[in-house]
């Protein structure tokens, strides 16, 4: 996770249905999807784009769960 960087708050207000659907999407996107969708030539502070995408997805899942949207 991005412990060495300043975090950027991203305020987002969603209707309940969109938040539920987004949490389902976040649950279903896997590491293999990040591998397939990322560039192998892009790096962020020495980390591959795939790994940064995967980390961001985990942060999104945690934020959704904290807001009460944690699909099984």
PLM segments and residue spans:
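Positively charged, low-complexity terminal tracts
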Residues: 1-16, 20-72
């Amino acid at each position: 996770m991005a412990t060495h960087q300043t975090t950027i708050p991203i305020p987002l207000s969603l209707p309940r249905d969109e938040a539920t659907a987004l949490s389902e999407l976040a649950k279903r996107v896997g590491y293999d999807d990040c591998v397939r969708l990322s560039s192998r030539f892009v790096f962020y502070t020495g980390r591959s784009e795939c790994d940064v995408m995967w980390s961001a997805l985990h942060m999104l899942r945690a934020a959704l769960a904290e807001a009460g949207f944690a699909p099984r």
